[in-house]
Amino acid sequence: MRLNAILAGCALAVAALRAVADPVSGSTTGAWIHPDPAASPIATTGVGTSTFTWGVAAGTPTPNILGFHAVAGGFSSVTETPFKVGSISYYNGTTESGTTPDSVDLALTLDFTDPAIPAVTSDYTFKLVSTPNQGKDPDADADYVYLPSAFSATSFVIGSTTYNVKLTGFENIVGDGFLTSNDLAFHVRENGTASADLFAVVTTQTAVPEPQAVALMLAGLGMLGLLARRRG
């Protein structure tokens, strides 16, 4: 009976240990890469940087702009809890027809201070849709940026713990005030802007001894205690 109670107590202790959240901290960098297509007359600037422009401006001060903005001072959270890694901003400039690519990738790197796991770098594709402007209906002339929605996890094993790092998606979407933007797409009028925050999460899995192994360990400890009492 006492052994059952001890086993139950051990199980509760293990569950409690697994439920303890560990600190997560680090920094994020993002760079826009691989505009497609990229050959002339497609016009782009900022490839390899955090600010990407595309198209030849026609009627607005600048062409279209996508920006990645890392969290100032880096991110700080705990495991199992989503945290903000940065934000995306979009400005819809008016551009000449035929000068805009169809997509661009964001190379996003999460560099961890805690836990001590390697940096995670992944590429995410943003679809760019430039609508021909008719000048009659600003909503019909609005452009789209389709946000990535599929995020795979990257796993690392340190000791007996598996760390899974995964983007969870976009939140806190702010549209241009006229059209609805969401976590799937920015839909923005000419000369308008939209933004969204990007979140990630680190989850853990810790190897737990099998019940039989725990029982054997406790039995061994019991025998040691019995021998110690006899010697005493």
PLM region spans:
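N-terminal secretory signal peptides that target proteins for export/translocation
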Residues: 1-2
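Short, threonine-centered small-residue motifs that mark membrane-proximal processing/anchoring sites
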Residues: 5-24, 197-226
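Mature extracellular "passenger" or substrate-interacting domains of secreted, surface-exposed proteins
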Residues: 22-207
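Short, charged juxtamembrane terminal tails flanking transmembrane helices
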Residues: 229-232
